[in-house]
């Protein structure tokens, strides 16, 4: 059996509403159809380039993301393109999207939504509507929907769907989850109506069913109607598994496909709308399986799926018919193509680090002062479509890379893509650098997997990878490189704290090792990202953990939603000492000075130091290379200790510059 045959279920086509899905992998709702120039009716070139990746990478269908059916149906301003004008000029952008998706071999759908009571108040727009009259969390007054509003809503969705159909789309996805309007009617938390739209499950499902029926009658049998639901709300008072299964049975009267997600937009990490690395992969699969058993139409599932092995297993076991990928396609848009070509080991599997998704736009914009992190930690081309064009080098060179962490490996892969000869020297017996600790943390297996994927790519492309090898003058003369790239990483910072070199002190990265000799009671010094993650790991391993941090904020260097989840776990399971300074480490524990100047001893069997990282000194190597008259470049943590994103990006860009 070859590698592709191992994924026979994942790669099998499926017929839905008269259309053939070429595989069982679907690109989750992504982006939207917009152009910042209101006078321009052409599609944004960067969005079209993203389609080439997400649809062209072998996925069966591409869903254009949340598209409000009216101006009042969008969360904020400028989200509504307008479906009243059916002119060629006005539909051109949609036609270009549909055509580009089809050109890449995928089916084209648009996700239609109405946010209901989650609406932000926009001057000049209609009064927001919802199941109940209330004032929402943003202070916006919400008007309870009337029968006339329901009729208008059906008409609005029909108009939008027909617009998409005329533009060449194969179907629409009705967004019935994540706390938007149809979800608000379904949930007993948000719907206490006493008319035919409230009370029983049938009544709470009625609005969704009415809209679906109207869409089916208007668009015909061969127009795909997909419904995206939150399989669970993951909040107190939310609907039950029995409720969501019953709801999906009602939807299946007119829908062709149920798409199972989870949670609420307002709290995406806490409710599993966007699972963090602390939730299981395929976190919605069991709910999807229950729904699949309750309906007689195909079921798709999204939620932390980043491996073809799990995707194949879910389909083979009958838990779902299709898998939906979002962040994974940001990490590697060629997921399906690599599986089909028998290269699954080269897939860059999403870390769920939350770099690419900071959370609810309005909150994140305010908290981050509009400075959203760009791109993906492990894909240097994400958010940079122009970077995918790797041109062959005009002059083929021999490139020597010193250091086999992810910066060096990425440089090796990209240099080989450009046609250079690559020799990589790694002084240890293993590639992956600082990420190798993660193989011992069940929550971080994807980090270790990324290092292995990078190694597999480098080997597949023909890089000469030499382990247990250091750079010497003799070796430099033997290799005769035209360019040298130094990627020798960083090391743990150890400030001059008395006792920090004691036998009861362990460095954070070493604390993950199976042979680490840790006592039951552990104090972690340092509440940055590394310290917080280590504290959570040790708690999960059964230790009693306390954490000491000089600042008043935990994990300020973590990405926003990952930071939120970390803080939740620490608040529940780790005792913290904030604004506290470590004075000394003794055999009995840690002596700290609190923010009020008081001094106390925190008892500890073991002290774990997570006090930052410092760039390794490249001076001797630079001098060696310079004496040979060879151009020398530095990338990654040996420039300055930072994040995986920086290492991968610099590795990629350095190879492009050669």
Ranges and model annotations:
Residues 1-402, 406, 410-417, 422, ...:
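Flavin-dependent oxidoreductase catalytic cores
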